[in-house]
Amino acid sequence: MSDSSQQGVPRVGVIGLGAMGQGTALALHESGLAVVGYDVSDRAREAFAAQGGQSAAEPAALVSCDIVLLLVVNGEQVEQVLFGEQGLVGRLTPGSLVIQCATVAPSQARRLGERLGAAGLALLDAPVSGGAAKARAGQLSVMASGDAAAFDQARPVLDAMAATVYRLGDAPGVGSSMKLVNQLLAGVHIATAAEAMALGIRLGLDPDTIYEVITHSAGNSWMFENRVPHILQGDYTPLSAVDIFVKDLNIVHETGRELAMSTPVAASALQQFTAAKGAGFGREDDSAVIKVYQRLSGIDLPEAANDPQGHDPKGNAPGGGA
């Protein structure tokens, strides 16, 4: 046990110091918890350390932690962190808690709970939502499931990182199921917002006026209101990338297939994000899905948003179509 644990303050490891992980780790640190952060990126670790956090050069430095928070990108990274060559399973002290926050398939979350349980470790299936700003403020929404002991053990961390914790069930998989519903809606809303803006621009409407009117009308959505400003500013710095929704909507599709349930609206959004990824925009902000419409219809996007391969000031589609 670490000194901090002996004094009643759990030692918390955060793996994944990207947009969400960096903010969450800093919120935990500023709440008084003993936090050590790890990321494969030197730049991410240095940024965390520059803001007062303690960073580690390798995952093995987190084996003394009582709680490990996973804020990685996907299920493959979860597997690598826990069961890979430098994996924490088998190194963490029995009774330690893993809080898994990545968006993964519900079936993977259930299997993960079984495997960690067999290793003497507890799992809280706890995907998050809210974005980088809320992560930094410790104001995330957490969709969690796990047994009562896991919730009790996680309480200091959840109190520091979340505005709302939804306690959804007593076993892993329920939290990930709810997150999948959220991601279906989020992905569809972003793709629809892009299509609506593209149509309005093609009709000759002023982009800023579209935003002003729609955000005060029944067609508004949280994603429209949050993402369209990125388009208006021509700023595609990724807060959540196109690649994320290619991954998440693929999980929606695969889960629907397992359940013999069609998800045609989500499938359409997935195709648009996949097209954006194929066009080279995978690492840009998810609002860059609008650039697919630019390439197809030649619309003139605001300022730096313009894609040189798709932009035609006469409004013609690429290839010279009328």
Question: Model segments located where?
Answer:
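Rossmann-fold dinucleotide-binding core
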Residues: 103-183
